[in-house]
């Protein structure tokens, strides 16, 4: 990023917009859906600082994934018979993650500190079912599982012989 006066800094961006589809034969119990485990988008960015003259190195990384199927649902029965039962797909919901790292060299000695998952946002897993209540269509959203993994810290000291 020297061109904007940020000497020793660099920036990276990687993003993907993905459309996947698993198709089934008509008349079967399965409903067309996105591929299991495939996020519809991914975002990875990073801001890096590297000053070899002073021995400093640092990074801030941001990652996000889109809502993705982690468990494929199923449909039983036939809607023409009026007794169809739908078990919805289970989704991992989008979440933001920021990682930090910094290191400093003192000759042959290097000290490095990292913080992973600085935001420590909860993981949410949900199911969505479309229903009709009193003639009105609506979606029921249920959290089937959630947990907060927390952030992790690391301090490393290395010496080169």
Specify the residue positions occupied by each region the protein language model found.
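Generic recognition of flexible, low-complexity loop/linker segments
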Residues: 46-47, 99, 144
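C-terminal beta-signal and adjacent terminal beta-strands/loops
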Residues: 52, 64-78, 103-161
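Flexible, solvent-exposed coil segments and beta strand-coil junctions
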Residues: 21-29, 76-83, 133-138
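Gram-negative outer-membrane beta-barrel transporters
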Residues: 1-72, 156-160
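Residues that define the transmembrane beta-barrel architecture of outer-membrane proteins
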Residues: 39-43, 94-98, 107, 149-153
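A broad helix-preferring feature
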Residues: 56, 99-103
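Extracellular loop and loop/strand-boundary signature of outer-membrane beta-barrel proteins
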Residues: 27-34, 84-89, 140-145
